[in-house]
Swiss-Prot record:
Gene Ontology biological process terms, A to Z: proteolysis
Gene3D superfamilies per record: Collagenase (Catalytic Domain)
Record-level Gene Ontology MF annotations: metal ion binding; metalloendopeptidase activity
Purpose of the protein: Has no significant hemorrhagic activity, but inactivates serpins by limited proteolysis of their reactive-site loops.
Protein name per UniProt: Snake venom metalloproteinase adamalysin-2
Species the sequence originates in: Crotalus adamanteus
Record lineage: Eukaryota, Metazoa, Chordata, Craniata, Vertebrata
Amino acid sequence: QQNLPQRYIELVVVADRRVFMKYNSDLNIIRTRVHEIVNIINGFYRSLNIDVSLVNLEIWSGQDPLTIQSSSSNTLNSEGLWREKVLLNKKKKDNAQLLTAIEFKCETLGKAYLNSMCNPRSSVGIVKDHSPINLLVAVTMAHELGHNLGMEHDGKDCLRGASLCIMRPGLTPGRSYEFSDDSMGYYQKFLNQYKPQCILNKP
């Protein structure tokens, strides 16, 4: 951490119509949940000297403006096109994460592009609202953001002290999670190789 420079991620979270309906159209419940999730994510990223702040939350109460389907790859592709063509024209932010209540094939909980932070089309991830426990959804979103920041998967049994590693494949329910040394190394390599500019400025 000592060697990692201070960086700032301005995050947009979009909650789809399925999430809106799942919480009985209660915007306050969704807002509170997303704010708590991003707070937890920010806590995880402190060890990497990254501030993650929620700069915009969109809740789609009407028709979803992008194609959300059981194929996570197609949904991720659709979100990327939407970010590039629509979102960036309205809000110049660093990354967008889609929170959806759809059932993806193969029990997928999330998906994201690797090494893509700051890229207009591919600085995106999708996360299934798969648990009532905020911590577990936060781990999934932190994991997808990790891919955007260059992190590959850890081993399936990876631990850091008593904590489970955030970049394990799949999700093991637990009480505490941290980034592994390998994850920090991948992130350092991403910074050196891609030199992402959008995360330099304070929100």
